[in-house]
From Swiss-Prot:
GO terms for cellular component: chloroplast thylakoid membrane; photosystem I. InterPro entries: PSI_PsaJ, PSI_PsaJ_sf. It is found in: Plastid, Chloroplast thylakoid membrane. It is a single-pass membrane protein. Keywords: Chloroplast, Membrane, Photosynthesis, Photosystem I, Plastid, Thylakoid, Transmembrane, Transmembrane helix. The chain crosses the membrane at residues 7-27. This is Photosystem I reaction center subunit IX. GO terms for biological process: photosynthesis. It holds the Pfam family PSI_PsaJ. It comes from Physcomitrium patens.
Length: 41
């Protein structure tokens, strides 16, 4: 179990989880507010 915790705390795994979370969050925001990501010019 300690090896699994050590593996999950490494930088590539944390970066993958973080970017996956951010991508999902942006997709959900874009789904509910489709024009929010477009800069108003």
């Amino acid at each position: 179990m300690q090896d699994v915790k050590t593996y999950l705390s490494t930088a590539p795994v944390l970066a993958t989880l973080w970017f996956g979370f951010l991508a999902g969050l942006l997709i959900e925001i874009n789904r509910f507010f489709p024009d929010a990501l477009v800069l108003p010019l």
